[in-house]
A protein has these predicted regions:
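Extended, low-hydrophobicity, polar/charged segments
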Residues: 1-245
Length: 245
């Protein structure tokens, strides 16, 4: 049989069900990205791995301040200009739903990236990279939570932002950002989603130690815990030993 095959937690995808596992052949040329913990037995496809961060050192608050950031439209430019760390910024990533082209904006900690499968699952729709038009009211390069039309735009906050007292974020105004942005104080109560990619050295969602590493694999099999997903949807019934439904 194959050596170096492991079972990893996976996304159920179109098959559905609440739990599924893939059997992965570990290899550097594998097309799937896997997250493994060196401190426990946790193993997952990156699309099914919860992203966990520690924001305890970032809890201090500051006054909300509108600051000019002329021509500074990227995280690197803004953090360099304002002398702020990447993990104290609120980065916006914009998508559109395939079904109606409605905009979806996901906010994530500036040193992390969005995982599209996790975002798709959180939104409950297929997505594609956005084409931002003037009519959308979205100011590319300076997008922030405050002032967005949430009747037209679906807004999500990744849980990597939870607990950060003072963030740098876009002001939805060309050449301007806010410093000291506090989500609960300046935006309101939100329900955080898990849509960020896990990273090497990240915190394991099972044992809590910062010992995650990234590997690659080739899928050689898959199992799904489907429960009654298909039997109920197809209205399947059976006769018992007495011939009754």
């Amino acid at each position: 049989g194959c050596k170096n095959v492991i079972a990893v937690l996976s996304d159920s995808g179109m098959m559905g069900g609440r739990v599924s596992h893939e059997f992965m052949l570990l290899t550097a040329i594998g097309e799937d990205t896997l997250v493994l913990c060196d401190s426990c037995d946790f193993k997952a496809n990156i699309e099914a791995c919860a992203s966990v961060v520690d924001n305890s050192a970032l809890s201090a608050t500051e006054p909300l301040t509108l600051v000019p950031t002329p021509g500074m439209a990227t995280i690197e430019e803004v953090t360099g200009f304002l002398h702020k760390p990447h993990n104290a910024t609120c980065k916006a990533v914009v998508y559109q739903r395939n079904e109606d082209d409605g905009y979806v904006i996901a906010f994530v900690r500036g040193d992390l990236e969005i995982h599209e499968t996790k975002l798709r699952n959180a939104v409950g729709a297929e997505l594609h990279p956005a084409i931002v038009t003037p009519e959308s009211g979205i100011v590319a390069g300076f997008i922030g939570p405050m002032g967005l039309d949430t009747k037209k735009i679906t807004v999500l906050f990744d849980r990597s932002l939870d607990g950060i007292g003072a963030l740098v974020c876009g002001a939805n105004k060309v050449d301007h950002h806010y410093t000291g942005f506090n989500i609960e104080r300046d935006y309101g109560k939100v329900t955080y989603a898990d849509v960020a990619r896990a990273i090497p050295g990240g915190i394991c969602p099972v044992c809590g130690k910062p010992t995650l590493r990234i590997s690659n694999g080739i899928e050689v099999g898959n199992i799904f815990q489907l429960g009654e997903k298909y039997t109920r949807s197809m209205n399947m019934q059976y006769l018992d030993e007495n011939g009754a439904l």
